[in-house]
Amino acid sequence: DLFAVDTWPGFGGRAVLIIIEGWFLGAEPQLDSELETAVNALEENEDGEGLWRGYANAQLGGSYQRWFAYIDHLILLKAPAFKQVKSWRSLQEVKLAARSKRSGSSRGIMNGEQLERFLEHFERLTRHCLQSLPGKADQVFYLDADHQVANHHVIKNAPA
């Protein structure tokens, strides 16, 4: 993300390993009944009828599942709770602000209110993933509040 596409290094040949990272990688859609109740103020005030929740869930159950089917080995870095995800994302914003201050650009830095609103967009699926993905992942690294691995559970060994 930080470099122009024309500066990216090229790769030739056949990859042995491709690592893909994402908040909702491997997530499955929620049951319709789980979408009925808003999980935060954003959903309550701006998606009271659940139209966005339903749309996002339908997308997650469609083309994303076809893409996720290509994953040979799913590894989950599991935060202790959504509260910790919020705290870590806040810390990330503080570090970004400090780096931006040094470079003289504060473009894209969120204040506390903006960050809270940003996180509300992802709260439902983050909570869902924290609950459901440990039962689906091939390996789970349980992180503590300080980002350290507190436990590691292997369900399926990585392909050779």
Listing of model-derived features with the role each one plays in the protein:
Residues D1-E28:
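Phosphate-binding/switch loop-helix module in NTP-utilizing enzymes
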Residues F24-A160:
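Conserved NTP phosphate-binding and transfer environment spanning the P-loop NTPase/kinase superfamily
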